[in-house]
Amino acid sequence: MCIRDRSNNAVLDNILTRRSCRAYTDRPVSKEDLDTILKAAIYAPSGMSRQSWQFTVIRKKENIQELAKVVRETLNRPDSYNFYDPNVIILASNEKDNTNGLADCACAMENMFLMAQELGIGSCWINQLKEICDEPQVRAELKKFGVPDNHIVWGIVDLGYAAQEPVCKEKNENVIVFAD
């Protein structure tokens, strides 16, 4: 079981209990919950408030499976590779020339993960696309979904209802140094 915050701090409690989910049920994520998760994304900080990101939402299973197939083939992954078979994926992309693109998308993705946790929805960060976006077969697939040619997909947000309680691994708390 995950450690919970006992001070009634909902934000800290979400941070302490959020874990990556790698098995989902077939229960769909509602449009209302998806809109709430996406609102959390667009209110994330971005360098110089540039907000040059795009969040591409893919809800149809066959489209998710097709993208996973292209990634699987490009990376020579096993046939079982499927982004953990989520109900929804959100591609977090940003302009290639934005030096803050990765950090901006990471902030937005963390907001989505925490909002999903608050709504009882499981999530996982999939990071394979960043290195292969410009492979011809991958770029063609991304183009079908409306990802601009000048964007890198820095991460994929998997969403769905957890098929099982995610495992809470012990955290290393010996990483903080006060240099007063």
Regions found by a protein language model. Give the residues of each.
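Acidic, surface-exposed loops and disordered segments
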Residues: 4-180
